[in-house]
């Protein structure tokens, strides 16, 4: 038996000791670094045709937030398809997913050593380990037998960790794979304490029938939380129906919620199911529920109390089995005190309240999220790599993010577009000059348009143009004072939310 395998047998006991899952993964990669003398390595989970980093060594922290599509990364696709050890020629022209992301090497990886170890359980791919060295001859003496041993050991460790997670968080669920419940489509990025607590709470409530009230500032990801609750529940195979209460005109609100029959009102040319019926057997997500009128709140309360609805114009009652997840950026118990929200409805909705922390309280998650969005925009722009400069990483951590995760997403995407325009290269680095995050204004705010709207209205324009210019100026000022919150802006301007959205589109604000 080779000395390398002997070394691995020696540390197997440490890997299987009572460490946390993350500590086991980190120990695995540290051992790979020490034994193979590599510059970087990563342990990846395979989900939804993507590789998700679980642990890294020698790579920038932002890598943990990235999700690598095998369709867009030929090296990772080769590892996923091979079924055995993959050694890439040192002069391979295939782009490396870690270009610019190895901590002790700046820029594109040219000639270097690269090995991929697929992690298989019963011939099914569950993950991979990637190993890179800047020395093109670093791994020449390694035998495939030795690498297969490492791969088998890592596959067993990863499989055990996934089974333990399934037992801990999904014990009451049916037998389908936990990976089917928790996929990239509803993944919540973040390792901060606040987000770990939130994930635990989602797992606890997902498979119950309790109504959930998701609370948090604009842009924190409340819809993503609702999505996760639905997809981790027994209702995942049925519909998740979305309704933005803030953009719901009062005139059609009842029909949108409960449906109508033919002839119920002018324009009702056929029967139509409302959101409650569309979500029957599934979940209805009521976003910005705090914007509902008191009259509509009373009708919603009745549906929740009795589990049936009436279509507009119909005398019949229709039973529905619909779970409610609601979200708001208002402090609803304060709204109850102010008489703007019904106390009985508040208690019905908030059986299980969840709070999504703002990004300023999640400093350690900022770079993970930045990496996630950088990988997204890389694929959309057709680039080989998008990386964050060290100085930019420091700036992102220090900024207070009034627009939360949504602001970060917009900032990264806008910066990538600017960086691409700055250079013809397919490998770009985002630098401080690509970002405009010096002021507390959210990127949701159309600042250029706001600046233009500040100019005095000229006397030589027509009444309609002058009226439009004044309305635009007023809306932009209200948006800025409310940090981009459209619902709060509608309240300040004393407008119906739906009418405000339509007016904003006509004026070119949205």
From Swiss-Prot:
One GO process term, biological-process aspect: phosphorelay signal transduction system
Amino acids binding ATP: 216-223, 279-288
Pfam family membership, one: Sigma54_activat
CDD domains to which the protein is assigned, alphabetical: AAA
Domain Sigma-54 factor interaction: 188-417
Example GO molecular function: ATP binding
Signal peptide, first to last residue: none
Residue ranges of DNA binding: 486-505
Keyword list, A-Z: ATP-binding, DNA-binding, Nucleotide-binding, Transcription, Transcription regulation
Pathway(s) per entry: Nitrogen metabolism; nitric oxide reduction
InterPro entries: AAA+_ATPase (IPR003593), GAF (IPR003018), GAF-like_dom_sf (IPR029016), Homeodomain-like_sf (IPR009057), NorR (IPR023944), P-loop_NTPase (IPR027417), Sigma_54_int (IPR002078), Sigma_54_int_dom_ATP-bd_1 (IPR025662)
Origin: domain of life: Bacteria
PANTHER family per the UniProt record, alphabetical: ANAEROBIC NITRIC OXIDE REDUCTASE TRANSCRIPTION REGULATOR NORR, TRANSCRIPTIONAL REGULATORY PROTEIN
Name this protein carries in UniProt: Anaerobic nitric oxide reductase transcription regulator NorR
Source organism per UniProt: Vibrio vulnificus (strain CMCP6)
Gene name as annotated: norR
